[in-house]
């Protein structure tokens, strides 16, 4: 089977979150006492975007937010951008154009069936599990499903695993003691992110949130500053309830958190 993405003009340059998980884990993947290697475990996360390139190419860029400058009037803005060209993770030939001749159709069969850091294990985790490259003759695509704001890709991948060292840790490292093949079912979720980012909440050590850090070149005009923001759900009041929210009244969120069981 062949799998194609049709990318409309409106999606070029938009940021897409990619989350990769093990949906069905491999037998013999876990060392005794290991806390990693079960169905549902996350194995990678990226933010990507598609861009038009020269010679009828579509580029997939892997986006990093480690260093940041948003003030285009700042002398540091150009310097930061010149030092942070986002890597091209993949290149695709345009196979056809959309109905309006602006969108593009690309063949992603080999990319999703193969081995890469965007849709599979991140490099560090793959190394700690001692996994080699994907064995293509023992791997295949289960299916690709498209929804309004997300795409779900399910594959079965087979890796050769090297022999374990004398001692291994319990957190994501080590795997089984012996070598051999590991076959597992993986799921990749590609979710279109909103055009307008959510309001960041800065980290305070007095409040128990997980956090993520980046280097801000605008916060301190005499140097750089490491900024930490918390990881949280995007809970925002409805526009018509904003004044009530500011007065401290209890209001319903614009988009509530829903758990499916």
Annotate the PLM regions.
Residues 1-261:
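Auxiliary tRNA-acceptor-end handling modules of aminoacyl-tRNA synthetases
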């Amino acid at each position: 089977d062949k799998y194609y993405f049709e990318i409309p003009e409106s999606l070029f340059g938009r940021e897409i979150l990619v989350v990769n998980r093990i949906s069905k884990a491999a037998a013999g993947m876990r060392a005794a006492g290991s806390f990693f290697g079960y169905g549902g475990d996350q194995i990678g996360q990226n933010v990507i975007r598609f861009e038009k390139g020269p010679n009828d190419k579509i580029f997939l860029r892997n986006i990093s937010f480690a260093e940041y400058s948003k003030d285009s009037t700042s002398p540091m803005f150009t310097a930061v951008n010149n030092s942070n060209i986002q890597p091209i993770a993949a290149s695709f030939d345009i196979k056809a154009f959309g109905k309006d001749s602006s969108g593009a159709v690309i063949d992603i069969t080999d990319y999703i069936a193969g081995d890469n850091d965007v849709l599979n294990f991140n490099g560090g985790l793959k190394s700690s599990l001692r996994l080699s490259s994907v064995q293509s003759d023992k791997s295949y695509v289960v299916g690709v499903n498209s929804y309004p704001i997300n795409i779900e890709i399910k594959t079965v991948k087979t890796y050769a695993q090297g022999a374990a060292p004398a001692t291994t840790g319990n957190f994501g490292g080590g795997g089984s003691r012996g070598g051999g093949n590991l076959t597992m079912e993986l799921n990749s979720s590609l979710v279109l992110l909103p055009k307008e980012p959510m309001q960041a909440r800065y980290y305070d050590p007095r409040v128990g949130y997980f956090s993520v850090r980046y280097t801000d070149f605008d916060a301190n005009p005499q140097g750089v500053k490491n900024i930490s923001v918390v990881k949280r759900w995007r809970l925002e009041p409805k526009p018509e309830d904003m004044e009530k929210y500011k007065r401290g009244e209890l209001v319903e969120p614009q988009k509530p958190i829903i758990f499916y069981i």
